Amino acid sequence: MIPNIIHQIWIQGYESIPSELRKYHENCLKINYGFKNEFWDNDRIRNFLKNNFEPEYLELYDKYKIYAQKADFARYAILKIHGGIYLDMDMVCRKNLGDFLGLGFFFTAYKLKNVFTNYLNGVIGSRPNHPVFDYIFKNMFLRQNDASNVTNSTGTKLFRDSITEYTKNNPTNDISLIDSKYLHPCNLYNDKNCPYTCTDCYIAHTNYSSWAPHLKLCKIFFENKYLIFIIIIIIFIILILLWIKYKFNKS
């Protein structure tokens, strides 16, 4: 059983949460009545690691320089000890997550136009002391020298590799991959209103991407893809006309 606790992290502290994300956070508290909310910042995380893990865990946490890596490491540690449901701060909550508390461990998959699939670590539910975390921490320590690569060292690739390794070694397990229509219905290429119009969703990711500016650019591209396509066509036509003019003048 997963405890009815929702964990959220903002390394810089509560007062530093952007106003847009704070609205999402407050809405999630209202939607998920009956849940205990736990907010974690850097100071609380460091004290937690110091009191619940061997010294090398805090050392590795401090070694990470990117906030996203610290948040990744912290969510795994928090869920290992306390259990509960972890949510990224840029999640819009639509339905109470109590329906998932009967599971042992759950997550969902991220898909990009059937070209790219990865396991999303922005929403994770777990009972305390789930053995999959042994694999996750083992791999984070093994990859600590690849700290410049967020996805591989702590993020979605690390998460996927660890779950794949665990399930391969433990065919009988309580790992649940939840259909993305319930936990991640909106991708970068979806309409920006998707988090508010999805019908089956319990939560929806807004793809705020605070740690990855290139993802924000991708989001802007997909939101304006038709306008950008028209601009590209116009530029292409202008280049063709200039080339024709050049050829004509040369002859």
UniProtKB/Swiss-Prot annotation:
Transmembrane segment boundaries: 226-246
Keyword check for Membrane: yes
Principal EC category: transferase
InterPro entries hit by this protein: Glycosyltransferase_domain, GlycoTrfase_DXD_sugar-bd_CS, Nucleotide-diphossugar_trans
Domain of life where this protein originates: Viruses
GO cellular component, one term: membrane
UniProt keywords, alphabetically: Glycoprotein, Glycosyltransferase, Membrane, Transferase, Transmembrane, Transmembrane helix
Subcellular location: Membrane
An example Gene Ontology molecular-function term: mannosyltransferase activity
Membrane topology: Single-pass membrane protein
Keyword Transmembrane among record annotations: yes
EC number: 2.4.-.-
Signal sequence coordinates: none
PANTHER family for this protein: INOSITOL PHOSPHOCERAMIDE MANNOSYLTRANSFERASE 1 (PTHR32385:SF15), MANNOSYL PHOSPHORYLINOSITOL CERAMIDE SYNTHASE (PTHR32385)
Family: Belongs to the glycosyltransferase 32 family.
Official protein name in the record: Uncharacterized glycosyltransferase L373
Species for this entry: Acanthamoeba polyphaga mimivirus
Organism phylogeny: Viruses, Varidnaviria, Bamfordvirae, Nucleocytoviricota, Megaviricetes
